[in-house]
Amino acid sequence: MPKSEIHPKWYPDAKVICNGEVVMTTGSTQPELHVDVWSGNHPFFTGTQKILDTEGRVDRFMKKYGMGSANSSESKDQKEEKDSKK
């Protein structure tokens, strides 16, 4: 026989609240769930996603740490070696 009163109380109509407004209902062990982000206001789901320019960030990193000229000279040397072997 299972023990009585060991399980939490279940709320089948728990309210999910975001920015002071009820956005949905669900089952939970708490009567109200307060969330900061949900699919209705998240940029990924609303289509207002900001895409970062990663190429510009890589170039800025290479320039900052002086790797841009080192990589380009190595690639030229490698090309010359390949051409001389042929």
Curated annotation (Swiss-Prot):
Query: Which keywords fit this entry according to its UniProt record?
Result: Ribonucleoprotein, Ribosomal protein, RNA-binding, rRNA-binding
Q: One biological process GO term for this chain?
A: translation
Q: Which Pfam family is an annotated match for this chain, by its short name?
A: Ribosomal_L31
Q: Where is this region: Disordered?
A: 64-86
**Annotated Gene Ontology cellular component terms:** ribonucleoprotein complex; ribosome
Q: Which residues lie in Basic and acidic residues bias regions?
A: 74-86
Question: What does the record give under GO molecular function?
Answer: rRNA binding; structural constituent of ribosome
Subunit structure, per the record?
A: Part of the 50S ribosomal subunit.
Q: What does this protein do?
A: Binds the 23S rRNA.
Q: Which family does it belong to?
A: Belongs to the bacterial ribosomal protein bL31 family. Type A subfamily.
Protein name as catalogued: Large ribosomal subunit protein bL31
Species: Prochlorococcus marinus (strain MIT 9301)
Q: What is the lineage of its organism?
A: Bacteria, Bacillati, Cyanobacteriota, Cyanophyceae, Synechococcales
